[in-house]
Amino acid sequence: MSYSVSAAQLWSRKLAMQAEDMQQHQKSQSNQIASCLAEMNTKQEVVNQTIGQLGRSISEVQQQNSQLVLQSLNQINMSMQQVALGIQDYASRINKLEQTMSDMNLKFEALQKEQNSNTKTLADCTSQMTIITKKLDAELKKRYMTTKQTRTVQNQTMPRSNTTTKKRVLAIDFLADDDY
């Protein structure tokens, strides 16, 4: 029996060694699983942090984009208002300019009518002056002829100078022009 005890001992030792090997194997597998789980947890935390950072970044970018869009829309709105005001100002200036032009056209037409009437008046005055000048010339010739024919002997000895006669003719013309 000692052989069988020894076989039983061997067998129990073998089983104990196998159990110990299995325990160590399970322990190493448990350690590997624990380290794998720890690594997965750390990686999950990194992923969660990255996802959180990405989420925050996305929300920040969305906020910035929405702010930029709002600012751009406000600037466009202000620009449109300025353009509208500019157009209104331009339209009022054009209206004033058109009004000024129509006023100037009316004044120009009035000036043309006045000029036409003045031209007619001037033409009438010129024709009247021509008639008056012809009459005066005729009267002067008559006077000159009568004065020459009725000269006395004393006057004939002292002939008049040309300048005195010219002065008299100019004086008569001057008086005729002023309607004296």
Swiss-Prot record:
The protein's name in its UniProt record: Meiotic recombination protein rec15
Keyword set, alphabetical order: Chromosome, Meiosis, Nucleus
Cellular compartment(s): Nucleus; Chromosome
Mutant phenotype after disruption: Abolishes localization of hop1 to DNA double-strand break (DSB) hotspots.
Task performed by this protein: Required during the early stages of meiosis for meiotic recombination.
Coiled coil ranges: none
Gene name in the database record: rec15
Cellular component GO terms, alphabetical: chromosome; nucleus
Subunit description: Homomer. Interacts (via C-terminus) with hop1 (via C-terminus); the interaction is direct. Interacts (via C-terminus) with rec10; the interaction is direct. Interacts with mde2; the interaction is direct.
GO terms classed as biological process: reciprocal meiotic recombination
Species in which this protein is naturally found: Schizosaccharomyces pombe (strain 972 / ATCC 24843)
